[in-house]
């Protein structure tokens, strides 16, 4: 059995053997899946620089949940720009980073979902797609993407526990549609990725659960399976 310290050493050695001086990990998943919590815990464990989804300072998010059709395009463009800037920062510096949600989730899940629900016009959606296509040519995917797979009851429970006022109006059908799109997206995602089933995990409070996730990440990076 390899101890935790040995795994950390192996993980760091992999980074240097790959001939790179930085690692980009990304945490993906639906609203309430635990992305931000896991990002924080992993950033402390690996001493990586965390990059969080800009939610609290987002000038559109509260308006969006009150009137999705009116503010959907504004919100998605804001997120697209914020995540693009994060990727530009990664390319400029030599720091290892861990990212809370990716630019691909915006383009392949949230924006198409809003369009299919009639909450984003075809004109706005096509404009969004053109912007993303231009951006995507200038950035690389993360070295490892960790997808947190969660059921609707698990998502709802987490959303209720964190108590964000603007999330009170999130509809169940909205979460279901997002979950369906996440599953479709991850099944066709080609770069290196890892799927974690989180319904029966409490990595925020249980160190063994967190340790199990860390072991899977390190094994994936090191090519142990």
What residue ranges belong to the model's regions?
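Hydrophobic anchor at the beta1->P-loop junction of P-loop NTPases
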Residues: 27
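A glycine- and Lys/Arg-enriched "phosphate-lid" helix/loop adjacent to the NTP-binding pocket
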Residues: 109-181
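Short, Lys/Arg-enriched N-terminal segments with co-localized hydrophobic residues
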Residues: 3-22
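Conserved substrate/cofactor phosphate-moiety recognition/catalytic segment
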Residues: 44-82
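NTP-dependent small-molecule kinase module
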Residues: 156-225
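P-loop (Walker A) phosphate-binding loop of NTP-binding proteins
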Residues: 30
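Conserved lysine of the Walker
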Residues: 35
């Amino acid at each position: 059995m390899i101890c935790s310290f040995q795994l950390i050493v192996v993980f760091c050695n992999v980074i240097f053997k790959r001939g790179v001086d930085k690692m980009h990990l990304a945490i993906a998943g639906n609203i309430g899946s635990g992305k931000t919590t896991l990002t924080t815990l992993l950033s402390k464990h690996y001493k990586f620089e965390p990059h969080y989804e800009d939610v609290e300072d987002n000038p559109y998010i509260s308006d969006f949940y009150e009137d999705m059709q009116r503010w959907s395009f504004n919100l998605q463009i804001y997120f697209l720009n914020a995540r693009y800037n994060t990727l530009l920062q990664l390319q400029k510096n030599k720091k290892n980073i861990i990212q809370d949600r990716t630019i691909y989730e915006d383009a392949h899940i949230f924006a198409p979902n809003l369009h299919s629900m009639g909450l984003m016009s075809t004109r706005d959606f096509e404009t969004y797609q053109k912007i993303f296509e231009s951006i995507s040519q200038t950035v690389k995917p993360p070295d490892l993407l960790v997808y947190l797979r969660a059921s609707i009851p698990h998502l709802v429970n987490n959303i209720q526990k964190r108590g964000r006022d603007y999330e009170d109006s999130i509809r169940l059908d909205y979460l279901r549609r997002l979950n369906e799109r996440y599953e479709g997206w991850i099944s066709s995602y080609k770069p290196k990725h890892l799927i974690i089933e989180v319904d029966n995990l409490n990595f925020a409070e249980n160190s063994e659960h967190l340790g199990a996730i860390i072991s899977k990440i390190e094994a994936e990076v090191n090519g142990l399976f």
